[in-house]
C-alpha cells in the first residue's frame, strides 16, 4: 500500500482543466492500486499564507522563544512537511499562470522546503532527503509552451523537486486550452494519451486500465 499526496493549485473550482486531469488520474490510479491511500490538499479551498516574517522567525529562533503566532506558523509548516515526507507518490495539479506556477503552489513549496527535513546541506552541496518518491505533474496551459523559452513552469518544478531528491517526475501537459475548441480537444486528447502511457508503464500495475476519456 502506498500513500498518494495530491496538491490542487487551480484557483478555479469549476471549469478547471487541471482538476479534470486530477480526477481522471485518481480514478484510474485507484483501479490499479485499490489499496493505496489518497490525501488531497486543495490550496484554493485552504489557502496557505505566503512566506512571511512569522514563519522565518519560527525557523530561526529557539522554540521556547516563539510567540503564539510563530508557533501556529511552525505547526502549519510541520504538518505540510510531514504530509510530503510520508507520501510515496506526489501528484501536483498545476495550471500555468503567467508562464509559471500559481502563487499558492509556490507558497506550498516555501512551507515544505525545510533544511534538515526535506533537504540538507552536505559537504558537496545541498542534498535532497526525499529520494525514492515519484511525482506526477498535471498541467493546463492556455497556449502551447512545452520546450519553449516561455515555459518557466516545467524547468522550475523539475529543479525544485530534484532539489529535495524527487527525480522520478512525469509531466502531463494539456496545452492550447484557450486557443479554441479544436486546439482544446487535441490538447486534452494528447494529455490523456500521455497519462495512459505513464500509467500503463507503471510496473506495479496488476490489472489493465480502461481507456482514458
UniProtKB/Swiss-Prot annotation:
Recorded family membership: Belongs to the azoreductase type 1 family.
Record EC number: 1.6.5.-, 1.7.1.17
Binding site for FMN: 10, 16-18, 96-99
InterPro entries: Flavodoxin_fold (IPR003680), Flavoprotein-like_sf (IPR029039), FMN-dep_NADH:Q_OxRdtase_AzoR1 (IPR050104), NADH:quinone_OxRdtase_FMN_depd (IPR023048)
Anything else known: Rate of quinone reduction is higher than reduction of azo substrates, suggesting the enzyme is better suited for carrying out quinone rather than azo reduction.
Molecular function terms, GO-annotated: electron transfer activity; FMN binding; oxidoreductase activity, acting on NAD(P)H as acceptor; oxidoreductase activity, acting on NAD(P)H, quinone or similar compound as acceptor
Complex and partners: Homodimer.
Species of the source: Pseudomonas aeruginosa (strain ATCC 15692 / DSM 22644 / CIP 104116 / JCM 14847 / LMG 12228 / 1C / PRS 101 / PAO1)
Protein name: FMN-dependent NADH:quinone oxidoreductase 3
Function, in words: Quinone reductase that provides resistance to thiol-specific stress caused by electrophilic quinones. Shows a preference for naphthoquinones such as plumbagin. Also exhibits azoreductase activity. Catalyzes the reductive cleavage of the azo bond in aromatic azo compounds to the corresponding amines. Preferred substrates are methyl red, amaranth and p-aminoazobenzene sulfonamide (PAABSA).
